[in-house]
């Protein structure tokens, strides 16, 4: 059965001046799923976020949210979307309690508990002024205000920016629990891949001009493998073989990244008459897999 897609980006092409960001990019985010967008700096993550929130019009193609073009969203559809962009909070002279009361007057379906549940979880005091908060605390107040609006779709750009490791773990556990319990759809980015791995259902990995992976994160980290081995020489090129997604080596130590299995990699080496030793499959986190797929540099 075809999933119900909340976000659909169809044949997106965009340039900055004459520089191609991506061409004919397609993205689908299914209802009720948490999707994480990963890519190196300059791969097009911010461009995608800006197209989704309507700040930027693609050169060609279109992005749809709930079936409407993001350049022309109706007021009803806009109310279904919560954006967190770098955690900016207006009215920083207010405290935590005052800003909640102020915002609640604009939203008829305001969920006060959603705001204070997050604030209490992160141990932010109700009387603390926004102006005295760290960047990470401000971002969480902004997110609390978004959750209280009860959107169906959350778009979170660098969602854990500025939080220390302990608070990040608290927030991630809370966010996953909240999204599943309330059946929310989430599209997010983060530079901290370990955080993303704990939170997401699906992964989208972009490299320059293209999508490398869009799949359930568990499927990707199960199928994509790293094998290490040592060779007698350090000048053997393996990158051009169809089985190789990426190959890194330092002197005679090789890291071979592939969607193939152990027997296929061993067969490749043996068919080329390459003597090898210390052949191992390495366990991989999402961060390891991302670096293996896109390269270290």
Model-predicted segments: where are they?
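Catalytic Walker B motif of ABC-type/P-loop ATPase nucleotide-binding domains
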Residues: 154-158, 163
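Conserved structural motif at the start of ABC-family nucleotide-binding domains
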Residues: 7, 22-24, 78
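C-terminal coupling/interaction segments
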Residues: 257-297
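ABC-family P-loop ATPase nucleotide-binding domains
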Residues: 85-141
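Conserved ABC transporter NBD signature motif
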Residues: 61-72, 76-77
